[in-house]
Amino acid sequence: MRIGLIGSGQMGNRVEEVAQERGDTILLLQTASKEATTLVFPELPELLIDFSHPDNLEKILSYSLSYQLPLVIGTTGYTQSQFQEIKEHAKHVPVMYSANFSFGIMVMNQLIKQAAAMLQGWQIELIEKHHSRKKDAPSGTANMLLQTIQEVQKLQPVYNWQGKKREENQIGVHSIRAGSLPGEHDVLFAATDEIFTIKHESFSNRIFAAGAVEAADWLKDQSPGYYKLEDLLMDKGV
């Protein structure tokens, strides 16, 4: 594949590393300034992978549409209106968005959905831990897991409990930022005298890069549409 890579941070570097190990060609963005009105690559990519910033969305969508390039998005922090733009864009080209490209997290997400449906009345807590340099809290993955739970149970999130007792129909959401923790997500279901926990730990952001590259390889053969990582897993029979 000829991958147009947008984003030169940790995740962008990991994607470049993983793709080159596979024998793919990475085309690095040649205009990275905020003032640039379009994207420029050394040659035309076959598809785009974005791990950059929400501010870049307009020019990314414009470039993708102009050349009909499939688009894999791993950037988090979009507004609801930006998500609507992405979904509208997906009517014309295949798009996959995921806050987390770990296949383990996707399986965890499905397990949480089942548990939330089966354990009605249990109290639920969501705890996520990341390194001290992470800029957003809760993480995009935590928000994804929360949304999955809320699709099953109408719970109101309370962020980092403080100074009041728990009420019905609430879910606690907690963020920890310390050291070099690569990423951990725990969803705890609690009832009287028992606790059930679903947990995922990542030890390197390489898993997210590998998932994004595999997603791109799958997405390039799909019709226009808005895809999630679960679609790839289902296609593989996972």
Model-identified regions with their sequence ranges:
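Aromatic/hydrophobic pocket-lining residues that form π-stacking "cages" and hydrophobic walls in ligand
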Residues: 15, 60, 86, 111, ...
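Residues at the C-terminal ends
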Residues: 21, 65-66
